[in-house]
Amino acid sequence: MIKSFFLAQFISILFTVLIFPQQVLIRGKVTDGATGQPLSFANIRISETLTGTAANIDGGFELKVLKGSYKIIASYIGYYSDTLTINTNSQINNLNFELRQTEVVLPEIVVNPGVNPALEIIRKAIEKKNSGKSLLKSSEVQAYTKGIIRTTEDITSNDNSIGVGVGGSDTTELIISGILENHSKNYFKEPDKYKSIIIARKQSANIPPDINILTGGRLLQNFYENDLNFLGKDLPSPVSDNALDYYYYRIESTAYKNSQKIYNIYIEPNLSSDPGFTGSIFIADSTFELIKVDLILNRAANTGGVFDTVNVFQQFDEFSGIQLPIDYRLFVKANLFGLVRIGFELNTILFNYKINQELSDDIFNKAILTVLPDADDKDSSYWIATPTIPNTSEEQAAYTRIDSLERVPWNFWDNFLLLSTGINLNKNISVSSPLSLYHFSRVEGHSLDFGIFANDLLKKRFNSALKLSYGFSDKKFKQDFTAGYLLGDYRTWEIKLNIFNKLKVLFEDSDNYGELLSTLVTLISKDEFRDYYYSKGFAFEVEGELFPVLKVRTGFSNKTDNSAFVNTNFSFFNRDKEYKNNPSVFPSKINTINIGFDIDFRDYIEDGYFRRRTSLGRSFVLFSGDIYYSDKNFLASDLNFKIYEFKSRVFIRTLKSASLNISLYTRYTDGTTAYQDLYSLPGNIDVVFNSETFRTLNLNEAAGDKIFTLNLTHNFRDELFRLLNVPLIKNYEIMFSLIFNMALSDLNESTKQISPHFVKTFKHPFYELGFGIGQGIIPFKIEFMWKLNYRDGNNFRVGLNMPLL
């Protein structure tokens, strides 16, 4: 059924192209009849149909219709609508409407003590919203979306990201530096099934196509819903069921749309500390339908004040007796720490509604948004036949400028950044940057590094990396080669190969620190927190989606491990101090077969190349499991063991934007494990913490081959202080989190016998408890943690949780 659905889509598109010669383009403009000023976003509709569009910011509009006779209606709040009858035998370029303004009346309302007349209007609007929602069983609508990126200078990009220049005066004009356009079909079926299909997309030459996925379906907001998600927070809409308890309303004025009286009502949260909307909503008298919103996010919804403004504009019209959105406009301006100024505009028009028609359940699968494989191949004839928002002169000039800049040959120095981790030679090949050419350890001493990386080759199917390193103290040359090839329409299967002969970090899976931090700590304090061993071998693995919620994998690995030793005593300071010994490992050759699975119930976005999982900010749970098998006889391995691992991650929305994160890990070993293959409880260095680690444990302090760990973090954000209405604190966006960790660890007797070192374990549960304090815009938080048992000399710690390290 799914294949037949997409076949139907293809046939529909083909039919559209074939009938293109019969279509006629209508261009026009809507202005104020008295002043000649454009009426931005005016509503255009073909009489007695479900077809229409909305003007751009300059009042310009486009319609594509078949040859025939039509009545075109232009309307705008505060103006009398105008209707023009046309016969479309050829293209029309000047179908201009000059609307006559109606009277704007300031309210002369008798206000009884304690009675706000706006509240009764809102109460009836909420009732109207709920009755209208009960009528909507399903819908299909087409959407055209245009996104505009504005920066102080032209942006750069590769296949995975966009780069924005830093600096510029606050008075520097923002220029259009990127444009995205797409055409989509969007489906809804009660109670909460959504699907969007991008049929065609195009963008300026400096924008990667897979970024162009914002369209008119679930990813956009509908102010007829109860809650709207902005910047990670669920905000009550102006007509939500609890809006009367959350917002303050005031009638600002009344206007007319033809003979229909329209109330212009000002809205803001009752408490300025509550996140929400401020601005104007427009509600029709007698019918009490919400017909337009023009709102901005208040300061409480704008965490850290990163955004100068977030302005949302949306209009509604009646289709089959139901009010539905006909456009969506989002205008964002941001000034990031005074370093980066950026603007973003999103303009969407929705047209050709089909209401309450039968929709197959096969449409609504795990892919909430799908980009059709040929969406990037549509030529100019397709776009001529598709309703769009006409380009302004500024947008057309930007397209021309950007395309000419992208034709300039690639310049190495244009992409060189001293502090980056890589230097792009072209869009797919990069090499190590100066920052990545050196590292230091007590085993290797001064080391030179070089890497070459290939990304997204062969239509984004092939990735590879070759890392080379030489240590001047251990006098060893190391190599690490990885390659992966992706299969399937959405690259859901991968064949991976890794060949290595390198120095490995001991218990590296439990070490979340960067190499730069390790180098600096070692050179400055001589207290290197890492240990090492040599390993060489290879690994081969195949993994992929067996079902949309199930990924499986299997592979084989071969490795030979040997101990490493301290080979230098160099340091910038503390030259008389000796480095600690590097612990020896169990020398061994281990061959393993592994099988595993991942279960992920989240929906995903098919961006034309990949499936990107998303929970849309909602709760979710993930599971994964692996089995590793080693045998002396069957695999010629030095040790016999079977390792069973299980992991789970749970994310639960609790109070508004607050959330609970739960991570569970368990490992059981049947057999004998080499010391270097034990699982070390993730610890930390003195004052720099990582999330989902044991803050009061040192790195590699406790380990085992039978493990159970539980990490719980409740991120209250600033919701707790808002809920408690704590004076002052509630207005400063103080982020609070509660942290609890628990662990069990043990060793098999056979593992103890071959271990070259004593291994600390927790045969009874180890507990620690603490909290973190941060501020919304600051990229780190201070955490305070206490041991609840196994108390020794390190029972309390304070540290910075800094993800950047």
Q: Each predicted region: which residue ranges?
A:
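Structured extracytoplasmic
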Residues: 103, 108, 112-262, 268-276, ...
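Exposed, low-structure sequence patches enriched in small/polar residues
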Residues: 235, 368-470, 474-805
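Short, acidic Ser/Thr/Gly-rich low-complexity loop/linker segments typical of extracellular
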Residues: 49-60
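Short Pro-Gly-centered beta-turn/loop motif in secreted/extracellular proteins
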Residues: 36-40, 62-69
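A short, solvent-exposed loop/turn motif at the edges and junctions
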Residues: 46-48, 73-84
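Extracellular beta-sheet/turn segments enriched in Thr/Pro/Gly and aliphatic residues
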Residues: 87-113
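Structural motif
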Residues: 22, 28-39
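Structured interaction patches on ligand/partner-binding surfaces of diverse proteins
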Residues: 53-54, 80-94
